[in-house]
Amino acid sequence: MDSSAQVIIANLTSPPVLAFALGLLAVLVKGDLRLPDPIYQGLSIYLLLGIGIKGGVSLRQSELSDVAIPALATIILGLLIPVLAFFFTGKLTKLSEVDRGALAAHYGSTSLVTFTAALVFLEQSSIQYEGFVTTLLALLEIPGIIVGLMLGSRHLKRDVSWGESLQEIFSSRSILLLVGGLVLGFATGTVGYAKIEPFFGALFIGMLTLFLLEMGTLAGRRMRDVKSAGAGLIVFAIAFPIGSGILGVVFGYASGLSMGGAAVLGVLAASASYIAAPAAVRLALPEANPGIYLAASLGITFPFNLTIGIPLIVLVAQSLEGMVG
């Protein structure tokens, strides 16, 4: 068996991905594996805070010069991807500008769970990556949403409530916990983190597995909307993440990241938001159809990235490493 197949099979047979598949299967057979909402909310808080804290600890150990250029590259990527998404949805679909802007906001932002699954995959594959990649996640979360909202609202005959929308973005649970975790981790350092490592370290993959079981049921319910999404949108929701993922890898190498770091930036670029972006879109672009942007981001792109996209982007990063090395 060649190395490419081994990489993909290793991802498909990992406990978190298998739990996600179980959640999907439960929806297909009309079973009930939904977690109680308080448990789901608790798991999301745990993952966001844990990722933030670990990223903050690593950021404290990094030099500013090591972080600055990748951070700038990430911001540029965050501004570019929603513009590309808006353009390609115009070529592949007959959607309105409002719906295309909503999609651009989702694909310009990031998915924490896809990011987390990528880190777990890299660690299980013994691939090293820069510890400050969580900072890149935080930087990529917001610009894409703002650009997407701007593109989608250009020709509306009403004023967009930007103040309320920006407040929703910056005060969202995902941003507060992620940035708050970064600050906590940076402040406490390795000594402080050692005291909480048994909770945020040893239990992490188990918690992620439970969370992805629930995400499988959510994605399964959104897949019902895929049938009405149209062929063009389905093509976009699979092909665009591949293209933006490769672009992210290229930006990663250009900014000086290692192979693992470039792969992480590629996964971030390929992912689509289903937490922060939907909340902002509901406020700024209420005319946009949730059945379109949630079917694409959660029903198609998220399962694709989780199963095929992550190992595919890692393989791309490994292939390009020889060219830039």
Regions flagged by a language model, labelled:
Residues Y46-L47, I51-I76:
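An N-terminal, globular interaction/scaffold subdomain
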Residues L218-A231, A237-P241:
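Long, repeat-rich segments with strong aromatic
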Residues I51, M215, F236:
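Fold-independent oxyanion-binding glycine-rich loops
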Residues M1-A26, D37, L64-M215, A229, ...:
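Alpha-helical transmembrane segments of multi-pass small-molecule/ion transporters
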Residues L25-I45, R60-Q61:
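Membrane-interface helix-loop junction between the first two transmembrane segments
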